[in-house]
C-alpha cells in the first residue's frame, strides 16, 4: 500500500528525523501532494526557514533543500492535471474541505492509499471527507 503524507511528515521523512514516522510508514510506498510539496519548498526557500524549518541548523536545511530540489524518484507526486477534476468534485460535495485537503484525498483515492498527516494539518473537513469516502486517514503528533 502507499501512504500519502503532508509537508510536515515529508520534511521529517526526508531528514530521517523521526523514528515514529519511519515506523508508521513501515516500508510502504510514499506519496505527497503538489501543494504540500510546494509549501515545504516555499518554507525551505525562505532565509529564516519559514514555519516548517524554524529552528533547523543551516546544514540541516541545506540537506533538506538538496532533497527537495531532487525529490527522490520513489516519492510519488501525482500531476495536478490528473487530480483537478476530482478535487473540484470533492470541494463541491464536502463542506469545509480545503483545496489542500481535496488534493490529499484525491491523491489517496487515485493511489488507493492511506492518508497520514501531522496533527497540525488535521481538520474536520479532511477528516469527515475521508470518513464518508472510506479513505484510511490518520494523524501523527509532531
Where on the chain are the PLM-derived regions?
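Acidic, PIN/NYN-like endoribonuclease modules and their adjacent C-terminal/linker elements
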Residues: 32-33, 37, 105, 109-142
